[in-house]
Amino acid sequence: MTTGAPPFSGSSPQTTRPQTVAEKILSQRGSAAVYAGDLAVVEVDQVMVVDSIAQSFIERMERDLGAVPKYPERVSIVVDHVAPASTVSVAQAQKEAREYAAKTGVRLFDVGRGICHQVLMEEKLAQPGWIVLGSDSHSTTYGAVAAFGSGMGATDIALAAASGKTWLRVPESVKVTLTGDLRPGVTAKDVALEMIRVLGADGATYQSVEIHAGDRFTRGERMTLANLCVEAGAKAGLVVPGGEILTDYGYDVPAWVYPDEGAAYAREVEIDLSALHPRMSAPSEVDNVHDVAELRGLKVDQVFIGTCTNGRIEDLHAAAEVLRGRRVDPTTRLLVIPASSQVMEEALQDGTLLTLQRAGAVLGTPGCGPCMGRHQGVLAPGEVCVSTSNRNFIGRMGDKDAHIYLASPAVAAATAVMGRVALPEDVAQVAASA
Amino acid sequence: MPTVHVFARDHINTDEIIPARHLTTDVESELAKYAMEDYDKDFVRRVQPGDIIVAGADFGCGSSREHAVWALRGAGVSAVIAPNFARIYYRNSINNGFLALECEGITELFQDGEEAELDLKGGTIRNPRTGKELSFVPVPQFALDVQKAGGWLEYMKAGEDVEGERLDNASTSAGHGHAGTPLGDDPAKEDGPRPEQASGHQKEEHHA
């Protein structure tokens, strides 16, 4: 099936000065070379609609616009935020989404297929140089493969589906350069949290974060980095392709998708990976980042491993490594929700899920789970949760007096074993059975 | 005169404006019952049609949910004034013809519950008790046009074309963002001189 807008011309439109990755993509998908501050009207390669706004989307398309998707193959509906349905009204909305997909020919990824961003990546519905708009703020995730991914509301999404285009102000870029090598036990999530601390919760508002990581990090790890960029307010989070990482996954990486030498950045920061220790974001803003060691010992009621940030196979492997032969502390509950059916299948086949199940984890249907507080593990007043997700706002996962701490899967797993905030090395004191 | 509700904290997020547990509808009057619930659960009992929210920086950060705009509008809020806004919230405001006014120092101008004089045409907001006044960043002409049309969809439909022609025209007239219409979702960060506000522009009464 054809996806995406027509093929790229192969070279950027006539440029007058060096460009960032964001400027390159918006130039390619628009009609002229554009720079930060310019307005670009651009072709949209893929429009993603999640279940929770599907009704609003359909209403805007049919009642307000009287339009059908201009390119049905460029529109995907994903049932992931509250899947399976939790109430009759949610079930009704999802029923309407299914009917709409059948009627218009747009793609539908139904209950259990997984979280929108993970699914679109697995289906290669985000590719280097593409523009992907999603009705979910974590659509910055597509920047993992150097696609300009951005979140928008229902009205914008409907317009993009109806017209095949959108308008964007070309963002300034913040250049984040990662240097050095991570210590053992430090992960992409720790890097992402540190990056948000350095940038600040609104430190990249309206801007594109351009991450220069060299040939470090897998596709999944790059998704974690790009995913968190919206927590600094960013419009997009673009990880510059490096080495053979993307070609190994079978992507065509256009030669133009790299930043030019001398491109203009609003701000440049450097993060020395070798200096990082496992990090944790404390309530109730994502940039409130500390070393896990500072929070060690805090009693935890629930641990959640999953989401578009950290629900991939490498994340489940990291958790299983800590949990193998051990048990979740009896005063703590552990929820594990794979990010997609593909992740789940892999984790079933290689025994990871069995390891987690034996350790006392509660396994859930691939999807968003309790991340946004609508089902499958919401928190009571006063409860403390360590989560591998991306937001620790007040009320995010249930009651407004619950407390959410964000961390990597390995730290989350260690915390589940100890019943308190812990580092992976702390579980050594708990004997593992064979 | 509208009453001002001051929520001075920075980074008030969409989970506080309209918690996800209430996203089961997009009917504004329904959403309105829960507006600001996790920040101030009594707000919906105090707010009157036409009232103004004054908030700290980065208002509306977090989720892309357009419900954050619908809930406030449904509750009768006519405008939110903050030093700056999270981008998706800001864009959603423009698209819905809802006023999001950028004004540095605004949280110092009012105490909660005071009345305000908002002069959209003049670009000022005044506290009649203290006599102090601040100018807000002019609303982009594009946003005013969208507001006049009743929202982005209506604006596009008025162009009789959802195929994108109107978008293309907008691009051309914007001169790529400098002179002319600052069509971007970030007028506060526009380089160069601010475009003149059309002084004779027909302003709609904001949603009362």
From Swiss-Prot, chain A:
Residues the record lists as binding [4Fe-4S] cluster: C308, C368, C371
Cofactor(s) the record lists: [4Fe-4S] cluster
Catalytic activity: (2R,3S)-3-isopropylmalate = (2S)-2-isopropylmalate
Cofactor binding annotation: Binds 1 [4Fe-4S] cluster per subunit.
EC code: 4.2.1.33
Pfam short name (any one): Aconitase
Protein's recorded name: 3-isopropylmalate dehydratase large subunit 1
Family listed: Belongs to the aconitase/IPM isomerase family. LeuC type 2 subfamily.
Higher taxonomy: Bacteria, Thermotogati, Deinococcota, Deinococci, Deinococcales
Subunit architecture: Heterodimer of LeuC and LeuD.
InterPro entries, per database record: Acnase/IPM_dHydase_lsu_aba_1/3 (IPR015931), Acoase/IPM_deHydtase_lsu_aba (IPR001030), Aconitase_4Fe-4S_BS (IPR018136), Aconitase_4Fe-4S_dom (IPR036008), HAcnase/IPMdehydase_lsu_prok (IPR011826), Homoacnase/IPMdehydase_lsu (IPR006251), IPM_dehydratase_rel_enz (IPR050067)
UniProt keyword terms in alphabetical order: 4Fe-4S, Amino-acid biosynthesis, Branched-chain amino acid biosynthesis, Iron, Iron-sulfur, Leucine biosynthesis, Lyase, Metal-binding
A molecular function (GO) term: metal ion binding
NCBIfam families, alphabetized: hacA_fam (TIGR01343), IPMI_arch (TIGR02086), PRK00402.1 (NF001614)
PROSITE patterns: ACONITASE_1, ACONITASE_2
Purpose: Catalyzes the isomerization between 2-isopropylmalate and 3-isopropylmalate, via the formation of 2-isopropylmaleate.
Pathway where this protein functions: Amino-acid biosynthesis; L-leucine biosynthesis; L-leucine from 3-methyl-2-oxobutanoate: step 2/4
Gene Ontology biological process terms, A to Z: L-leucine biosynthetic process
Keyword Iron: yes
UniProtKB/Swiss-Prot annotation, chain B:
Pathway annotation: Amino-acid biosynthesis; L-leucine biosynthesis; L-leucine from 3-methyl-2-oxobutanoate: step 2/4
CDD domains linked: IPMI_Swivel (cd01577)
Region (Disordered) residue spans: 163-208
InterPro entries assigned: Aconitase/3IPM_dehydase_swvl, AconitaseA/IPMdHydase_ssu_swvl, IPMI_Swivel, LeuD, LeuD_type2/HacB/DmdB
Catalytic activity: (2R,3S)-3-isopropylmalate = (2S)-2-isopropylmalate
Keywords: Amino-acid biosynthesis, Branched-chain amino acid biosynthesis, Leucine biosynthesis, Lyase
Molecular function terms from GO: 3-isopropylmalate dehydratase activity
EC numbers, comma separated: 4.2.1.33
Membrane-spanning parts: none
GO biological process: L-leucine biosynthetic process
Subunit structure: Heterodimer of LeuC and LeuD.
Function, as annotated: Catalyzes the isomerization between 2-isopropylmalate and 3-isopropylmalate, via the formation of 2-isopropylmaleate.
Family, as annotated: Belongs to the LeuD family. LeuD type 2 subfamily.
Xref: HAMAP family: LeuD_type2
Protein's UniProt name: 3-isopropylmalate dehydratase small subunit 2
Classification of source organism: Bacteria, Thermotogati, Deinococcota, Deinococci, Deinococcales
